[in-house]
From Swiss-Prot:
Residues 1-20 form the signal peptide. Its main location: membrane. PANTHER family: OUTER MEMBRANE TRANSPORTER CDIB, SLR1661 PROTEIN. GO terms for cellular component: cell outer membrane; pore complex; type V protein secretion system complex. This is Outer membrane transporter CdiB-2. Potential outer membrane protein component of a toxin-immunity protein module, which functions as a cellular contact-dependent growth inhibition (CDI) system. CDI modules allow bacteria to communicate with and inhibit the growth of closely related neighboring bacteria in a contact-dependent fashion. This protein may be required for secretion and assembly of the CdiA toxin protein. The gene is cdiB2.
Length: 584
């Protein structure tokens, strides 16, 4: 018998081996697709957290102008004259361009509010002191709206006619220019104003903010008088460092399945076209080089350019992973990839000393597949398009800063996109309709001589549809509800998480100790029953930065633990995390 087996042909041995290697079952395919979705969700969480941090840390320019008194009370004087009519006109001696800028005959004209302000005093008996108070009050009202070089004068006149005539001298921009005439680049993409426009402080603030977005560029401004009445030059003093930045970081934000240690490196180029634009490209890779059974990597890039009150940003990123997947009698190799292209257009709608309100439109294309043993899993295929409209706001309450956004997001059939194969049966869909809310409040305060800062962050979404895992709210990681190891997440089509953190700066060391308490909840029509819907966790840690002549270094070290979790939810009792960053 042994002799017979010894002479079996090679083809027979191959057949026996192939029979022993079973094909992946539908359950194996579902597990592989889920693993891919979890990896992509982790990468998406990291990007979302970075985007929220960038929003909160974005430069803001605020200028102090005196608050106007609503309507000064006029004194009783002798002599005084009853004034029934007010005239606010630009003197004929000024250029035609200045006269056009100062027009206020129509309700939507720039200075129409000034005429309405004057009308408050119609019918009152006004003397010399009253005229002075009116001119001062109107000047403050104009100044409060940002017209810091516009003036109001009183020409010679006879008040006994019952009319008070005032002269409006519009403050116009003669030139916007660099202090250093040899400086390369332009201010025109950053500033919403041009030569001959009325000088408004809010326009200047917008331009300065757009130039300060470039991290290696700092800008200050002064106003120099021109030759004609009301004319001024806006002179920009620009200080620039090296136009490139390399950032490298390492952390343990990954999972055991695809590499706990993660490394990132990026190159940022400031002003590549001299348009106050920004270009950045980065690469991430797991650092578990000793084990070739699993891994993850990806790259990302974005380009952003301003145009006055507009900002356009084009982003692209990929995520790829592979890992062993244990089946009943054998182990398969599961892998997947995701590619995303995103275009975002932002517009500042209004701005004041304490508030900047904007709108955004965003178009996203997403492609992805999951594989098991190199074979595509049809149910995991993604070719989706999303359109988003939203409002965003930054508001200052004293020393506190609030950043918030409210957006409507919808999946569409544009650009050749297809829906999920489960959508026809009422399952998960990429054609969902969703509302997304983000908010962050940072409040510094002092007890005795010790400064503190309280930071609270909220993220939530609501939809009436069943969405894919990648489009769900997930909780249980360092980017959402802290205190959990991130190996297992709770996910739902609807949900929110709320993070709270108290920071305590340590003297002048650049180090801050912090403690946090987070809570999250998810729910919705999910295809798989959840072990629970709520998580709460606590964290303590230290973070800070250090500047040297060789570069800047940052660190964040923390330990967290669950406060509440469902009984069937697996996680470590204590999770220790870190992130180290170097910038050159």
């Amino acid at each position: 018998m042994a002799t017979r087996f010894a002479i079996l042909p090679v083809t027979a041995l191959i057949t026996l081996t192939a029979q022993a290697q079973q094909a992946p079952t539908p359950n194996d395919q579902a597990a592989a697709a889920r693993a891919n979705a979890e990896q992509n969700q982790q990468a998406q969480q990291r990007r979302d957290a970075q985007q929220r941090d960038a929003t909160v840390q974005a430069p803001g320019v605020r200028s102090d102008v005196p608050r106007p008194e609503a309507y000064p009370v006029l004194p009783t004087e002798t002599p005084c004259f009853q004034i029934d009519r007010f005239a606010l006109d630009v003197p004929d001696s000024l250029p035609a361009a200045s006269k056009a800028q100062g027009a206020s005959a129509l309700p939507m004209d720039r200075f129409a509010f000034a005429r309405d302000w004057l009308a408050h005093y119609a019918g009152q008996c006004i003397g010399k002191q009253g005229v002075d108070l009116i001119v001062k009050g109107l000047s403050q009202a104009i100044l409060a709206r940002g017209y810091i070089t516009t003036r109001v004068l009183v020409p010679e006149q006879d008040l006994s006619t019952g009319a008070l005539k005032l002269a409006l001298i519009p403050g116009v921009i003669r030139h916007v220019r660099f202090e250093d005439e040899k400086l390369l680049g332009t201010w025109k993409t950053a500033f919403p104003t041009r030569d001959g426009d009325v000088l408004n402080l809010r326009d200047i603030e917008q331009g300065l903010e757009q130039m300060k977005r470039v991290s290696s560029q700092d800008v200050s401004m002064r106003i120099a008088p021109g030759d004609m009445p009301g004319e001024s030059d806006v002179v920009l003093d620009v200080k620039r460092g090296k136009p490139w930045t390399v950032v490298a970081s390492i952390d343990n934000s990954g999972t055991r399945a695809t590499g706990k240690l993660q490394g990132n490196v990026s190159l940022g180029i400031d002003n590549p076209l001299g348009l106050n634009d920004i270009f950045n490209v980065g690469f991430n890779q797991d650092l578990e080089f000793g084990d070739k059974r699993f891994g993850s990597h990806g790259w990302n890039a974005f380009y952003s350019i301003p145009w006055g009150y507009w900002t356009g940003t084009l982003s692209a990123y990929t995520s790829t992973y592979f890992q062993p997947l244990a089946a009943v009698n054998q182990t398969f190799v599961a892998s997947g990839n995701m590619k995303t292209v995103d275009f975002r257009l932002n517009r500042v709608l209004t701005r004041s000393r304490n508030d900047v309100l904007g709108a955004q439109v965003r178009l996203t294309r997403r492609f992805g597949d999951s594989y098991i043993e190199g074979t595509t899993i049809p149910s995991s295929h993604q070719n989706a398009t999303f359109l988003e409209f939203g409002l965003n706001d930054r508001h200052y309450f004293g020393s506190s800063q609030f950043d918030g956004s409210l957006a409507y997001r919808q999946g569409l059939g544009w650009l050749g996109s297809t829906d999920s194969m489960f959508a026809a049966e009422g399952g998960q869909t990429y054609r969902f309709k969703m509302v997304v809310l983000d908010a962050n409040l940072s409040t510094p305060f002092v007890i005795g001589t010790q400064p503190f800062k309280y930071v609270t962050t909220f993220h939530g979404q609501y939809t009436g549809n069943t969405v894919s895992y990648l489009d769900s709210v997930t909780i249980g990681s360092r980017y959402t509800v802290r205190g959990f190891d991130g190996e297992t997440l709770l996910a739902g089509s609807r949900g929110f998480y709320w993070r709270n953190e108290l920071q305590v700066p340590v003297a002048q060391t650049g180090l801050s100790a912090y403690a946090g308490l987070d809570y999250g909840r998810v729910w919705g029509p999910e295809p798989v029953a959840l072990v629970g819907t709520q998580l709460a966790g606590a964290v303590i840690g230290v973070k800070g930065s250090l500047m040297t002549r060789f570069g800047g270094y940052g660190y964040d070290l923390f330990a967290g633990t669950p406060v509440y979790k469902p009984s069937g939810f697996p996680t470590a009792r204590v999770t220790v995390g870190f992130q180290l960053t170097a910038q050159f």
